[in-house]
Amino acid sequence: MAVYRCGKCWKTFTDEQLKVLPGVRCPYCGYKIIFMVRKPTIKIVKAI
């Protein structure tokens, strides 16, 4: 399940909510530019 964020109102929504409107638009404000939110990962770097 992918999570997306709107470029205008910054609300997050899932891909099921994205399928409600035709095309790729924010289901809250209708803005066309959306970003896919990455899962927070921790990168461990070994100290020298």
UniProtKB/Swiss-Prot annotation:
<keyword id="KW-0862">Zinc</keyword>
<dbReference type="GO" id="GO:0000428">
    <property type="term" value="C:DNA-directed RNA polymerase complex"/>
</dbReference>
<comment type="function">
    <text>DNA-dependent RNA polymerase (RNAP) catalyzes the transcription of DNA into RNA using the four ribonucleoside triphosphates as substrates.</text>
</comment>
<dbReference type="GO" id="GO:0003677">
    <property type="term" value="F:DNA binding"/>
</dbReference>
<dbReference type="InterPro" id="IPR029040">
    <property type="entry name" value="RPABC4/Spt4"/>
</dbReference>
<feature type="binding site">
    <location>
        <position position="26"/>
    </location>
    <ligand>
        <name>Zn(2+)</name>
    </ligand>
</feature>
<protein>
    <recommendedName>
        <fullName>DNA-directed RNA polymerase subunit Rpo12</fullName>
        <ecNumber>2.7.7.6</ecNumber>
    </recommendedName>
</protein>
<dbReference type="InterPro" id="IPR023464">
    <property type="entry name" value="Rpo12"/>
</dbReference>
<keyword id="KW-0479">Metal-binding</keyword>
<dbReference type="GO" id="GO:0008270">
    <property type="term" value="F:zinc ion binding"/>
</dbReference>
<comment type="similarity">
    <text>Belongs to the archaeal Rpo12/eukaryotic RPC10 RNA polymerase subunit family.</text>
</comment>
<comment type="subunit">
    <text>Part of the 13-subunit RNA polymerase complex.</text>
</comment>
<keyword id="KW-0240">DNA-directed RNA polymerase</keyword>
<keyword id="KW-0804">Transcription</keyword>
<dbReference type="GO" id="GO:0005737">
    <property type="term" value="C:cytoplasm"/>
</dbReference>
<dbReference type="InterPro" id="IPR006591">
    <property type="entry name" value="RNAP_P/RPABC4"/>
</dbReference>
<keyword id="KW-0548">Nucleotidyltransferase</keyword>
<feature type="binding site">
    <location>
        <position position="9"/>
    </location>
    <ligand>
        <name>Zn(2+)</name>
    </ligand>
</feature>
<feature type="binding site">
    <location>
        <position position="12"/>
    </location>
    <ligand>
        <name>Zn(2+)</name>
    </ligand>
</feature>
<feature type="binding site">
    <location>
        <position position="29"/>
    </location>
    <ligand>
        <name>Zn(2+)</name>
    </ligand>
</feature>
<keyword id="KW-0808">Transferase</keyword>
<dbReference type="GO" id="GO:0003899">
    <property type="term" value="F:DNA-directed RNA polymerase activity"/>
</dbReference>
<keyword id="KW-0963">Cytoplasm</keyword>
<dbReference type="GO" id="GO:0006351">
    <property type="term" value="P:DNA-templated transcription"/>
</dbReference>
